[in-house]
Amino acid sequence: VTEHLGFQIGDERAYGVGMFFFPQDELIRSQAMKMFEIIVRKEGMTFLGWREVPTAPEILGRKAVDVMPYIAQGFVGKPAGMKAGLDFDRKLYIARRVFEQSNEDTYVVSLSSRTIVYKGMFLVSELRLFFSDLQDEDYKSAIAIVHSRFSTNTNPSWMRAHPYRFIVHNGEINTIRGNVDKMVAREENMESEYFRYDMHKVLPIINQEGSDSAMLDNALEFMVMSGMDLPLAVMVTIPAPWENDKYMDSEIKDFYRYYATMMEPWDGPA
C-alpha cells in the first residue's frame, strides 16, 4: 500500500503505525500533522509518511457522520540500533504523549509497531464495511480482538469508542475517582529506568477527559511501558477478590497483599 504513496516502510517491526482521528478542518489538520512529524524526528525516529484511511461514511448514521474525524495513518521508522518490539513501542509512546500534550484537536487511536486499533461510532457488524482495509485479503494479523460497548456513563463519541490501546473492558469502574486521584498524587515520585530523562514527557499519566475505561487503559499502558509485564500489570490494577477467599492459596494471597500496598484496585461490576 505504501509503495503507491511514495514511501517504503521496511521490514516487519521496523516501523510503527499510528491511527489518528484528525479534525476535518484542513488547515488545523495540516498543522497537527506537521507537529507530529516534528516530534517524531525530535525523538530520534524517522517519519515515513501519511496515508488517508479508506472509509465508507455512507453507512453511518447522521450523528456519527456529523462528528466524523478525518482518519489517517502515520508511519514511523525505527531508529537504527534500537531493539524491535517494546523498546521501539516505548519510544513511540513518548512521542505520542508529547504530541497529545501539544495538540488537543487530534486523538491518537493507537501508535505502535505491534498493534493497530480500528474503531468508531458504529456497530460491530459495520466495522468491516466502514474500514475497507479489513476487507482486504492481504491484510493479515496474528490475532484480532473485537469489542462493542455502548456508552453508559459518558456521551458517545469517536474518541470514546471501544477498544482502547491496551484493554478491551466494559468499564463501569466504581472506584474511578479515587483511582485517578491516587495516580495523580504518585506522579511526583514516579521513576523508571526506561524513562530516566523522559518522565516529564509522559506525565500526566491519566487523561481525565477520557471515559473510565480510557483512564484504566492510560494507567495500564504506563505500567507496561515503565517495565512491568502486562499480565502482572493487569493483576495489580484489577486483582481477584482475594481478601475473603478462604480457598485461595496463601502464596497467592500474599502476592495480592504485597501489591495492594502499591496500587488500589480499579474495581467495578464489569
What are these regions (language model features)?
Residues 1-270:
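Conserved short alpha-helical segments that host acidic/polar catalytic motifs at enzyme active sites
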